[in-house]
Amino acid sequence: MFSNNKYPANAQPPEGGCSFALCVLPFAFFLLFSACVEIEEYPNNPHGNFEALWKIMDEHYCFFEYKEVDWDKVHSDYSKRIDNNMNNESLFKLLDEMLQELKDGHVNLYTPFDVGRYWKWHEDFPPNFSADLIDIYLNKDYSISGGIRYKILDDNVGYMYYGDFSNGLGETNLDYIIDKMAICSGLIIDVRNNGGGLLSNAEKLAARFFNEKTLVGYLQHKTGKGHNDFSKPFPHYIELSTRLRYQKPVIVLTNRGCFSATNDFINSMRYAPNVRILGDRTGGGSGLPFNSEMPNGWMVRFSACPSFDADMQQIEFGIDPDISVELKNQDLQKGKDTLIETARALLVSKH
């Protein structure tokens, strides 16, 4: 009757890039301008492209030590399989297989004919989400503001679903939503299957649930070519919003489809007062993704800057909820979402 949907994470090709170079995008915590770190050139043949890709990752990928990946062994294993006579499709499959050794959803190989991706961070787990159920709860009388669908449920619990942090979100959008939800006994923020997007939108939303500037994590960047050549940790704060802020209990719903910017949003919300996280462990994805171009014009995206929580703990492999709840099949068949119903009961009992 109802489908327990899995949606793939966003896998759009990166914009920009500079030939044979690592393109470092502007990021406020350590750069005031964009830069490109030049790497040595390689011939445009299968061996040359293999060596170029391996070298890019060797010098710039940020999770080798944390994930205990022996990248030299990977080189030894895969270089034996490279043949200058292999066609593009065969080369792509081999290089993508090599990149999957990193088990990183932020690692993609972009070609004109396919996109290499690692999606096991959510495909190997129960989705705990159904888009059909969300449509039932929202019905037809919901509002839309800045990519957020929201309404007040019949027990006076506010509900909002934000499925993509790439969707525009302005301060005025949030003012309208929070003002409408002010009469509710509590608020459910559903970000299940949100594969990420703009960190600025994630932080803009999170800031509406803090009453003071709050440390939520740390960031580092590479300072050299070694696997452990990192800068000192830079503290990352959620700044106090001067706009309307929500003061009642909040429950954030999560599943394995919460990745990248959504993982960062969940991490921030853990430090907000009156907020609890309910559902399943998130999908992770805490490395800031940069991109580089290979000799043949293919593009590789990868995690280049690690981020941590406020205790300097890794969140690359996800964040556990405060309250673990799975979507029960018997509820699914009845048109009920176990996570939403559990959150509603908790919020009503607190009122």
Put a short name on every predicted segment:
Residues M1, G17-S19, P26-L32, C62, ...:
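Intrinsic disorder/low-structure terminal segments
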Residues V37-E40, N44-E51, E89, N156-V157, ...:
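C-terminal "post-core" interaction segments
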Residues Y7-P13, Y61, K73, M312:
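Low-complexity, compositionally biased segments
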Residues M1-P43:
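Bacterial Sec-dependent N-terminal signal peptides
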Residues F30, M181-I183, L244:
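Alpha-helix termination/capping residues and helix-transition junctions
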Residues A35-K222, N228-P235, P249, N291, ...:
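Flexible, low-complexity junctional segments that flank or bridge functional domains
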Residues P26-F27, E65-E68, D72, N85, ...:
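Low-complexity, intrinsically disordered regions enriched in charged/polar residues
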